Amino acid sequence: MMKRFTKQENSWVLYDWANSAYSIVVTTAVFPLFYKSAAAESGVSAAQSTAYLGYTIAISTFILAMLGPILGTIADYEGCKKKFFGFFVSAGVASTAMLAFIPSEHWLLLLLFYTVSAIGFSGANVFYDAFLVDVTPEKRMNLVSARGFGLGYIGSTIPFIISIAVILLAQAETIPVSVSAASQLSFFITAAWWGLFTIPMIKHVHQRYYIKKEPHIVINSFKRLGQTMKRIRQYRALFLFLLAYFFYIDGVGTIITMSTSYGSDLGIGSSSLLIILFVTQVVAAPFSIIYGKLAERFTGKTMLYVGIVIYMIVCVYAYFMETTLDFWILAMLVATSQGGIQALSRSYFAKLVPKRHANEFFGFYNIFGKFASIMGPLLIAVTAQLTGKSSTAVFSLIILFVIGIVILAFVPEETSTDVSQQQNDLPL
């Protein structure tokens, strides 16, 4: 019988509850609408503002992709993982709070602080993901990782509901606050939520697997980084999984971050978009947990196939989408898989990596994900500019899922795993 979740597991899971508010309010819902409105008031066309947002996302992910591997390598040393985690959380929370105080006419400055907040959010996730090996054994990783995403979707709905309520009341002129001010209040609420519920993670989760500190940490970290690059190619399962992940997670991330902007381009009202995104969060919560449970029965790889195929259907459907009802259907399709595919990717990879070098390898997990996240938004941005049609840009993402699922077919089936044990026994 499955034992109850430990204090360390619950504290780790609770960070998903904390940072998912940023993911829905800032990345997906309110900020894109606030930014699109601010840019439109400054005379920027819908297609151009979508392109600028795509470029901004690409820049932030490129910066983190450059920093991720070396920071992860340094963080493998004793006592370093939590320090780096705390630094990026602090940067993310502070810059998110700053979005609440920048006048809407300064839309370029908004993009700048959004970039910093995105780097803080994603940077903290590198170390958060790597802590999975410290808080739970391999046999529970799928379950704990999926619980994190599930709880994250549930928790994010609370600040999201508050944000929607304030914005809708402002639109109806029920409260003496402008829609712009109401939107910015949601950024401050998100920052406070993120910071508050990070505290249990800081207090109760500790680095169990590490390398003893030595002289010249930075220099030696660069040396170890080079060694890791060579070793990754030697681990066939690990390398193939990262390659598949590079493509399919790009499509997933791009759809998540650009969905609200796309809906706005189709003429769907901001109120409808916010409600749709809220329902998406509610639906996604149980499906994330279901993915984790089904992975215990059918293997994580099988459930990854399911998620990728659903996203391929999303790309095709998005091309023909015209009405708000179509967007509802699209959102529900995404909701069934977005949490599950991310949770199982995280736990699948965690089972393959040497635990003492988890940050080092998760740094590469991050760089594969982040470089992929550059390609997707750029594909959206360039296609939108060339064709003037957001639907064509979204449809083009299907090629990423096709390539990803083909490569994933060559990855050995998930086991408990012999590969991971062999890697842990190797002198690194």
Curated annotation (Swiss-Prot):
<keyword id="KW-0813">Transport</keyword>
<keyword id="KW-1003">Cell membrane</keyword>
<dbReference type="Pfam" id="PF11700">
    <property type="entry name" value="ATG22"/>
</dbReference>
<feature type="transmembrane region" description="Helical">
    <location>
        <begin position="361"/>
        <end position="381"/>
    </location>
</feature>
<feature type="transmembrane region" description="Helical">
    <location>
        <begin position="55"/>
        <end position="75"/>
    </location>
</feature>
<feature type="transmembrane region" description="Helical">
    <location>
        <begin position="302"/>
        <end position="322"/>
    </location>
</feature>
<protein>
    <recommendedName>
        <fullName>Uncharacterized MFS-type transporter YxiO</fullName>
    </recommendedName>
</protein>
<feature type="transmembrane region" description="Helical">
    <location>
        <begin position="14"/>
        <end position="34"/>
    </location>
</feature>
<dbReference type="InterPro" id="IPR050495">
    <property type="entry name" value="ATG22/LtaA_families"/>
</dbReference>
<feature type="transmembrane region" description="Helical">
    <location>
        <begin position="238"/>
        <end position="258"/>
    </location>
</feature>
<dbReference type="InterPro" id="IPR024671">
    <property type="entry name" value="Atg22-like"/>
</dbReference>
<dbReference type="GO" id="GO:0022857">
    <property type="term" value="F:transmembrane transporter activity"/>
</dbReference>
<keyword id="KW-1133">Transmembrane helix</keyword>
<comment type="similarity">
    <text>Belongs to the major facilitator superfamily.</text>
</comment>
<feature type="transmembrane region" description="Helical">
    <location>
        <begin position="272"/>
        <end position="292"/>
    </location>
</feature>
<feature type="transmembrane region" description="Helical">
    <location>
        <begin position="324"/>
        <end position="344"/>
    </location>
</feature>
<dbReference type="InterPro" id="IPR036259">
    <property type="entry name" value="MFS_trans_sf"/>
</dbReference>
<feature type="transmembrane region" description="Helical">
    <location>
        <begin position="392"/>
        <end position="412"/>
    </location>
</feature>
<feature type="transmembrane region" description="Helical">
    <location>
        <begin position="182"/>
        <end position="202"/>
    </location>
</feature>
<feature type="transmembrane region" description="Helical">
    <location>
        <begin position="107"/>
        <end position="127"/>
    </location>
</feature>
<keyword id="KW-0812">Transmembrane</keyword>
<dbReference type="GO" id="GO:0005886">
    <property type="term" value="C:plasma membrane"/>
</dbReference>
<feature type="transmembrane region" description="Helical">
    <location>
        <begin position="84"/>
        <end position="104"/>
    </location>
</feature>
<dbReference type="InterPro" id="IPR020846">
    <property type="entry name" value="MFS_dom"/>
</dbReference>
<feature type="transmembrane region" description="Helical">
    <location>
        <begin position="149"/>
        <end position="169"/>
    </location>
</feature>
<keyword id="KW-0472">Membrane</keyword>
